[in-house]
Amino acid sequence: MNFKKMNFNSMKRIALSLMLVSVSMLSVQAQLLYKISKDSTDQKPSYIMASNRLMNPMGVVSLSGELKEALTNTDQMYFEVNKTAYKETINDAKKLADGKTLLSLLTPAQQTKLNAFLKKYMEVDFRSSYVQKKYGNLTPAALMEDMEQLLFVANHMGMYDPTHTFDQYFEAQAKANNETVGGLSDVDAYINATYKSDLKQQVARLVEFLENEPTELAKLNKAVGAFKAQDVDVAAKATGAHVSQPTLEAWAAKVQTVMAEKPTFFVVDAANLGGENGLLQLLRNAGCKVEK
């Protein structure tokens, strides 16, 4: 017997048990947890946990038997992007370069649409000092993220809490187990695809969101409802994947490389997991066994 391994796993179980006490009101959904393995190898299985970027995990995900087993029997944790390790880099990338401001990118008509949205949900004008300090130099994509959260929170008070996200929840698990944390996407690739993409396209997407508020809210509601129903395919269909198809394909390759090194616990947004072209299907296509 490998006493050191047994001792380490025992320590992990103790840490998980202590955390379970603190979240004893939660209920785990095994259908959001997938076991991934390669039939041709003797490597221990890895696991993928579906997450949702707008929901507070407290009350949705907890340490059930299946999840405790997955966390105990894996040796590292991977997210879509290791945002914690590169927090400052990502925050800097959200800001417009060369002294540009968001107002300078928007036409008067587009500014009017943004003002109407902010007045409805924040009761402030975009030109106010508070809003300018908070949003004035953000890229349209970064502002879009915040506006999407604002729209969802305003219509679902208590369901989203920026201090309790899925990534934060599972990062705490990794920290308790002294595990390595990594990202499926390199931080530079993530930044380039998200905040440094064509500004005109970013503005167009922001304006589309502002002009179609009811439709956008319906998409978010459907995705969240699908997540609660543990249906990643419907979640993916509701909003579409949040990343490009080439990125999903790169992730599928990275998952296989990482899990071949050591058993890994992956946390990926449900919208990126489900669907005919989602990460789970790409892994199946590559010969991986995907089990609920």
Regions found by a protein language model. Give the residues of each.
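Bacterial N-terminal signal peptides that target proteins for export
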Residues: 3-16
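Classical Sec-dependent N-terminal signal peptides that target proteins to the secretory pathway
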Residues: 17-19, 24
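Sec/Tat signal peptide C-region and signal peptidase I cleavage site
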Residues: 25-30
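Short, surface-exposed beta-strand/loop micro-motifs that present aromatic residues
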Residues: 32-37, 256
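Structured, acidic catalytic/metal-binding patches in enzyme active sites
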Residues: 38-239
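A cross-kingdom marker for long, charged
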Residues: 238-292
